[in-house]
C-alpha cells in the first residue's frame, strides 16, 4: 500500500510540475523584472509571453506592445492610439501609457487573424504597419531591438526624432 501511495504521489507531482518547457524557457529568457508588475513594466519586451494565456500572469491580452517616438530613439510614445482591425473587420483600440506600453485584454477583443494596425498621435501624425499581423499580438515578437535582417526594430511613430510632433524646428 505504501508503494502504491508513493507511486501515485510521484506520478501526480511529475504531472503537475510538467509544463510547456518552450514557454518556460521564453519566460525565463525575459530575465528579472526590475519594476513592479503593472501596466508600466517590461517596456519593449514581448508582452504575450506572460500575458498570452499560458501564464505566469493571470491577465490575458490579445494585443500588447510598446511604442516609441522615433525609429532611432528609445523615448516612449505616450498618448498614442493603437487601432487594430482583424480579418472579420472587428475593431479594438488602446492608448499608450507613460512608458509607451499599451494592451488590449482578451476578454474585450479576441481577433481573427490576420490583423492590421496603425498608431496615431493627437496632432494627426499616423504610422500604418505595411504588413499584417499573422498570429501573434505581441509586438516585440517581431519588433525587437536592435533592428536587424530579422526585425524592423521597435515600433515608432516618426523616422527622425527631429520631426516628432510638437518638437521645435532645429
List PLM regions with ranges.
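C-terminal motif of bacterial Sec signal peptides marking the signal peptidase cleavage site
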Residues: 14-17
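Bacterial signal peptide processing site
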Residues: 19-21
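The canonical Cys-X-X-Cys-His
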Residues: 42-54, 136-147
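Structural motif
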Residues: 56-58, 66-77, 166
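Short, ordered, surface-exposed loop/turn motifs in non-cytosolic proteins
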Residues: 72-88
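Short, acidic Ser/Thr/Gly-rich low-complexity loop/linker segments typical of extracellular
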Residues: 88-99
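Short, surface-exposed beta-strand/beta-hairpin micro-motifs centered on an aromatic residue
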Residues: 99-108
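A short, solvent-exposed beta-strand micro-motif common in secreted/extracellular proteins
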Residues: 111-123
